[in-house]
From Swiss-Prot:
One of its GO terms (cellular component) is nucleus. It comes from Saccharomyces cerevisiae (strain ATCC 204508 / S288c). Belongs to the SNU66/SART1 family. The keyword Phosphoprotein applies. Keywords: mRNA processing, mRNA splicing, Nucleus, Phosphoprotein, Ribonucleoprotein, Spliceosome. This is 66 kDa U4/U6.U5 small nuclear ribonucleoprotein component.
Amino acid sequence: MNKTENLSIEETNEIREKLGMKPIPVFQEKNTDHKESLSIEETNELRASLGLKLIPPQQNFNSSPPNVHNTSKIDELREKITKFQKKANAPLRMAHLLEETNVNDDSSWLENMDAIPSSHESKRSSTLPRKGATKEDENIDLHNVQVSYNIEALSPKKDTILTLKESSIFDDTDSTEVLENVKAAEENADREKLRLRQMNKDRRQKKKILNVSSLDIEEEEEGEKHSITTTHLIIGAEQGVMKAPNTISAKPPTGKVKVNFDSANNMSDEDGGDFKPLKIKKRKIKDPRSTKARKSKITDKMEIVKLVDEDESLSWMEEEQPVTIINPRTSSNNELKGPEDLAREIEKARDEEKRRTESILKMREISNSIVVDEKVTFLNTLDTSLSERSATENKVKVHGEGEKNIGDVTNGHTKEGSGNNTLTEAVNNEPNYEGDAENAPNFFSGLASTLGYLRKKSVFTTGDVDLKPGKDVNNSESLRRDVRNKEHTGTGTYTKDKLHGLEQFTSSDSSNANTHSKRQDHYDPDIKLVYRDEKGNRLTTKEAYKKLSQKFHGTKSNKKKRAKMKSRIEARKNTPENGSLFEFDDN
């Protein structure tokens, strides 16, 4: 069984104090006349009757305990204050070699490690003030902080929050800590930015001519900072106004002369700031005595070139296809043609027309096709009774005087006699279309309607539909080959390199043609391939390639597909009509 011990409040408070806990407060009972006060024995009797725990008897119950709670709280606060002071006083830079270390510095913790007591009581006694200590001893650990404002600048009505001023961590100098109002500092910086921006705007709009550079502005800002730091408050152990240090200006060395140049005139482009004055270079005016007259170069006079028509020598082109060059430009130098020249030109035109008609007649006699020229005379040779006659019938009509007119009625050709130019009887005896005037043929309405009518009457023989297109391709290839093999004659000058290139081209072309002909020596378009399986059954191209791919990849079809293919092969065996499709013709 565990034993239970009852402790009094005083004992409990002693234990709690050793553990650093808050003691239990003890309240004294006030003696009231109108209420009965029971002793501990009477209270225990009542608690025993109620089944409650008895109160142990206590000695000196009314005596007040010592004020231990207040002393422990003060000690804790002092410890915290000393810790914060040590952190604030710790230097941010490393100590130099020849610099003496302070006892409170963090750099001297190795030297003073044995001197600092390790026990909690000795530490508390060292931090707590002594009874006989003076005010100077108490203010040793307090830290002096400077304020960047005077007493007049700080308004007593408004609360101001001061924070440490930002400083660079790379600054090796012993910079003192300064408190400032963040809002006021930001307002001053914004006000300065607005002022500089307005100055820049005025400079661009040429309202002001500023002889101020960015270096001058930086010097002005440094001067303002120096003036602020010279007169500021001190908060800490010694409160008051710090006086400006008396700095002795360095005397210039004797025996030397110092020359100060004008900074505005001798300022380089790199050192010049945003507000550098604009410099406009004056235009250099040359001496009129030294100027030389510019000589104008006159071009050579253009000679008149006589134009030579090279096409006049090509007489064979004039016979086959005369070319008429129309020059719309009229020149005053052209002389007026006389009547003899005009008569000569008219006679020449008549001769050309006569020669043309004779050539057309010769073409009609030689060929069996219709020759269409620019005249309408060939339309008179057409007969409207073509449907009543056969497509290959030719009639010979004899004139009363004995002269013959031979006409090919099917193709619409006529041959005129030497005596009289009379039309054939077939043309004169035109049938009358009185019933349907709309369906009557009209050869003079256009060439398209005439050709359409001739197609309807089966005058034109159309090509066979059953002919293979391969023959046309072969014909076109033969024509191309003939054209390629023709030797083109022409006049021109070639260099040695060009001639060598042409010879190589012709030799390569002939070699390619020979190789192409050799490849096609064994070509036979009538060969037919027959595919058979291992059992000798005929297969189509698709089935044969499918079997080859399955054999190559090592796969096979399922039972359903194999049965379907087998039934298809059996059905093909039973049909004797397809025998000629898969075998060679014996004939």
